[in-house]
Amino acid sequence: MQRESFGSRLGFLLVSAGCAIGIGNVWRFPYITGKNGGGYFVLFYLVCLLLLGVPVMTMELAVGRGGRKSAVLAYKNLEKPGSKWHIHGWFCLAGCYLLMMYYTTVTGWMVNYFGKFLTGGFHAGMTGDEISGMFGTMLGSPGSMAIFTELVVVTGLIVCSFGLQKGLERVTKVMMICLLALIVVLAVHSLTLSGAAEGMKFYLLPSVDTIREHGLGSLITDAMNQAFFTLSLGIGAMEIFGSYMSDEQTLPGEAVRICILDTFVALMAGAIIFPACFTFGVAPGEGPALIFQTLPPLFVNMSGGRFWGTLFFLFMVFASFSTVLAVFENILAVCMDTFGISRKKAVLVNGVLLALLSLPCVFGYNIWSDFHPILGKDVLDSEDFLVSGLLLPIGSLVYLLFCVSKWGWGFDKYVAEANKGKGLKFAKWLKPYFQFILPALIVVIFLQGLL
């Protein structure tokens, strides 16, 4: 059977960017940018993206394009006879399942809040405490959460059931174009608020005092971590799209374009959040509290708030659901490639699996609220720790070592694949950096995540 491929280069770029762009762009990037000296952090972050994110992304894409299969079989096609690099492909699959065990639930939260704003569930006259309290009410309702979570699972698998071009690519292209338009409209509106100048000054104006307060080491560490984790590298989510690529463009050039789209969304998210927070005198935070407890009262209290709140959560639905679709495609591709089953059968089997696997996260805030499986963390944070703290950094290190070591694919073969086509190319003199410095940086990030 001939392997599926993207219908266009734009489709590849938007689907890959959709995989990278997610909730972390909104609920983490703006906060750590403001905390770490604004413009200085953005500068260090961009440098870290070029030095860390782009090279590792090209390695995942190169394994996919070179092997023309999903992770397990791509490794087998490229590894030396008798070696066991392909075992990592199974860990990639486990990482994708783990990620979807909680990401589908969080996406369900976004859908829930989009519906609340659209139908007037949040309205003028509600107090800030009432609006913020609705998040706790939602978490305490397992039935409601399960419905929205399973809605995400079913919708995602239905889209993917239509195939790469007619399903994933077609839907993601529309979502990503709408997402980019929405975030520009929301940012422009935020910049018209009375606290916009003060908010943007805190967000992006370079501040030496802030760096002194938190330390240059903290700035560099946060920049490295954000550059690494924002792209969701290490579990094969990008590798599968490499297997669907053409040979017409170089991988470094395409990786840079994906990073530009990801960074644009992250920067625009801050342009939405900080002006609103400073206008209403609210301290900007991070994580779910920012999205579900800090921002909804602000939307309700601003002119036309229901409209702007609806647009914001529609943007969040697109940002999170594009990641869900991308990872679902990876899971389905592994099942089709490795077990030789049809896409329809892979969808049916994984529909049951993902519907069941998503329930522990749903129950972790209510029925199983006393269950803290890892280091005292609740279910969602435990699942996230396994993915972000272990599988992403270790997986990225495995991809890197496979691509640059003589025991794996080998640096020369990797660079030849990465440089195939038109566009930006890696120079051969980068070999020592890729073989020694880059692995050390990933080990540092991994160890910091454990501390």
Predicted features by range, described:
Residues M1-W27, V56-L61, R65-I87, S246-T250, ...:
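Membrane-interface "cap" regions at the ends of multi-pass membrane proteins
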Residues Q2-F6, E169, K173-F321, L325, ...:
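Membrane-embedded translocation segments of transport machinery
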Residues E4, G34-M59, S144-M145, S388-P393:
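Extracellular loop-to-transmembrane helix junctions
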Residues G11-L13, C19, A146-I147, L261-L267, ...:
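Loop-to-transmembrane helix boundary motifs in multi-pass membrane proteins
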Residues I32-N36, K84-M100, G136-G140, L151-M175, ...:
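Membrane-water interface regions at transmembrane-helix termini and the short interhelical loops
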Residues H88, L93, F339-G351, S382-I442:
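C-terminal membrane-solvent junction of multi-pass transporters and transport-like membrane proteins
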